[in-house]
């Protein structure tokens, strides 16, 4: 390491072209379970090299509007950088809380559930049929709980090429920390991205070895540490080092380069 069958009902709510690129945007309402749908914001370049399913942090209840804006979470690292990902040549699929979780606590307490994995499984089927490129799960902060848990559950179905974990949840507090998951059984590549000045109480850089030591040593894994940028506000919020404020382009470029090479 480097330091069940699914009935898919799709409703296209909106589609438009980004003004300065060949990136299109769609809103997809995807049937994932009986009487449950999940709204997905999908950005697609002309010739995508991979598809990235992005999991925002916090409670995860974005409440995506038909025009692609959100009621909550627009400053989240993965949300505010979505166009950077797409312009670098990968599909971006941003997942909202499913229709049966669109009220508090949203995804809190749900990210490690079988239902969450079923929702994402339905999305992987859509992406495979639509694009036929490798699919990666990318999470930030609380979203790393989703990326890791879903990745582990779906790995034997060959739906997911690997996972990317940024500002990972490292200790237990109101959730299920990633080091407590069975990552030693995950047989696919893992990229860990962290900031060495992350002082959020559940993602402190000083605790990162709790996660890196749990990875399967047979995988093509890598740990990437960033040091630059600026920090504003609470240490656990999106515009602090926890959210890679000021170095978004560098971080996203590293992630995209890594998933394409792997």
Which residues does each PLM region occupy?
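Primarily recognizes the serine-hydrolase "nucleophile elbow" in alpha/beta-hydrolase
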Residues: 125-185
């Amino acid at each position: 390491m480097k330091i069940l069958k699914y009935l898919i009902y799709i409703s296209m709510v909106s589609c438009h072209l980004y003004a300065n690129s060949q990136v299109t945007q769609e809103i997809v309402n995807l049937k994932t379970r009986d009487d449950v749908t999940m709204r997905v914001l999908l950005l697609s370049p002309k010739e995508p090299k991979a598809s990235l399913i992005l999991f925002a942090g916090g409670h995860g209840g974005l409440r995506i509007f038909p025009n692609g804006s959100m009621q909550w979470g627009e400053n989240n690292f993965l949300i505010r950088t979505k166009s950077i990902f797409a312009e670098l040549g990968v599909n971006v699929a941003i997942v909202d809380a499913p229709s049966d979780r669109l009220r508090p606590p949203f995804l809190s307490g749900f990210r490690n559930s079988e239902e969450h994995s079923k929702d994402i499984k339905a999305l992987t089927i859509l992406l495979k049929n639509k694009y036929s490129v490798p699919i990666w799960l990318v999470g930030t902060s609380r979203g790393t709980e989703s990326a890791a848990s879903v990745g582990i559950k779906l790995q034997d179905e060959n739906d997911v090429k690997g996972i990317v974990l940024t500002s990972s949840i490292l200790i237990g507090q109101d959730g299920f920390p990633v080091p407590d998951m069975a990552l030693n059984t995950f047989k696919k590549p893992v990229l860990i991205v962290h900031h060495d000045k992350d002082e959020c109480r559940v993602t402190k850089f000083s605790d990162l070895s709790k996660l890196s030591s749990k990875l399967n040593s047979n995988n093509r894994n890598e740990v990437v540490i960033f040091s630059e940028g600026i920090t504003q506000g609470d240490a656990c919020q999106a515009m602090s080092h926890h959210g890679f404020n000021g170095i978004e382009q560098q971080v996203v470029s590293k992630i995209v380069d890594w998933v394409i090479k792997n």
